[in-house]
Amino acid sequence: MKSAALQLHNAANDNGLELPLSWARFGICVFPIAAETKLPLIKRWPEQATTDLAVIEAWARRFPGCAWGASTGDSVFAVDIDVPHASKPDAANGFATLASLQWQVPDTVTQVTMRGGMHALFRAPPRESGWYAKTQAGAAMPADWCAHYGVPAGYRLPGVDVRGSGGYVR
């Protein structure tokens, strides 16, 4: 993925096509979701998510004011770093968890979330490698990923979730 400095995106300030078009240009499949509920606005979104800029622009006209989902699965997975917020003031702070490990988000596609957390998107290893990212909360990261990024294998990361096969991030 490209430089995080060029791709940091604040979801709270996005109401247009900047986000989905930039994701698509980097090979991340996107689809429209309802801004309030984060629910997909198209049927069969896992199959319909696309990097086709013309399709994305057509969806923007069809669903004005929609938000956008980035599909995760075989080619891309996301690390979702949560923070405490008004509706969950006692939630774990994922940034604090990662800081306690002296771990920083590697150079990748990132986005500040609506509640002040972060989504960091990564290319998934080829399926034939045997590696598989599944969607899970309080993630125990895969051993090879942990080794590569310096996180203890099997460590549960409070406030850090993985979005993998069948998942998406907003």
Segments predicted by a language model, with ranges:
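Conserved phosphate/metal-binding and DNA-contacting active-site motifs used
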Residues: 1-170
